Amino acid sequence: MPTLGLTPASLRVVRELGFGQWTPIQEQAVPVLLRGADLVGQSATGSGKTVAFGLPLLERLALDAPQLQALVLCPTRELATQVAGSIRALARHRPGLRVVILAGGTPATPQRQALEQGVHVAVGTPGRVLDHLARGLDLSRVTTIVLDEADRMLDMGFGVSVEKILSAAPTERQTLFFSATFPQSIAAMSKRWQRKPIHITIADNAATKPEIRQVAHLVAPPDRLKALVAILRAHRPRSVLVFCNFKETVRVVTTALTSAHFGAEALHGDLEQRDRDRVMAKFRNGTTHILVATDVAARGLDISGLAAVIQFELATTPATYVHRIGRTGRAGTPGLAIALVVAADQQRLQACDKVSGGGIERLPLPTPTSAKVTASENHTPAVLGAVETLFISGGRVDKLRPSDILGALTGDAGLQATAIGRIEISDRFTYVALSAAVLQQLLRSHPTLRIKAHNFRLERVR
């Protein structure tokens, strides 16, 4: 594995995180970024872009100066949270590094307080960053600005906000655009704000193209719910994202699946941010196996290891269809994409088939014995699992880290490390995956847990 010009500290982290080899975007972009050049990097979602810009970004920071030096803009709060988490992981051997998330859905006051105390990196959404600029955010020491998923930011109407932010930063800086596509709007913005950028395009060839089996089932409109249940029982996906075109349909489908004894959660635009965080924590750690969502609510979600995508209603456009099915089949793992279509959808299905490269199989609804199990690791013996989620009433604002949580649970609480699953820390709360039996026993003996000299409330997430 070549060093790409990275320092020993960066290479140590790469080894510890288990990277066997560089992805194409990483191998080509890292040396360019270490030279300080501007860059337009075009590659698909899930290709390792965060590591590609994160490692060089960290190497350019002056940690002894707690001033904002790098700004990463993302289209959604969820993506900003994921990118910030990745940067923190890459900086594990850079003591003193401070990263703040500047995004909506959470109070702005703690964000302002973090900025006042001094941070090195800010990861945020254009709207919230612009709000902080209006309140005095200082970008005068910023040396690197990254636009992550730049095409989606412009599609979502953030173009004016992004340009206002770029105009508030020093002209002598490194400006990076990462995007899955390179439309004219990105080309025009690059011409205005970048200096002789290097263009890197990673082709979506056979070596990088995900392996996604696409299936369409023709159903009568009144039979959609019955068909969905049949599919879930036949394929038994370990994790599945069910897409609906309207939030009211999300509610109906979630209620129906819950009544049928499937562990399903709804994700739509009416959810408060705390409820959204709770839903996503349960889905990521395996407490919930089925997530029912609209396209808008699912923007920015990067769910690793998603076994299947089911379109309860066919996507309204071919581009949306491609975006939906692209959530599965990542990191070399086969994926399954199923669409329920009615007679009126046939012409749209043909358009989706053409844009996605063909290969949509038109099949009758499966039975448990007829479903093809393409990858055993993507299936579970039962949709309902024995994992539950523990809520801890403290998070990043309390300076909690996963190691603190693990230490308290294995220390004072007496749990075995092997009984503790995914630990997900948000600004003010923490979610931990535990087996149902372990969680029940823990709550009986510990209504609170002492972590870093403070007591935090424990609850079962419902």
Question: Could you tell me what each predicted segment is?
Answer:
Residues 1-462:
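Conserved helicase RecA-like core
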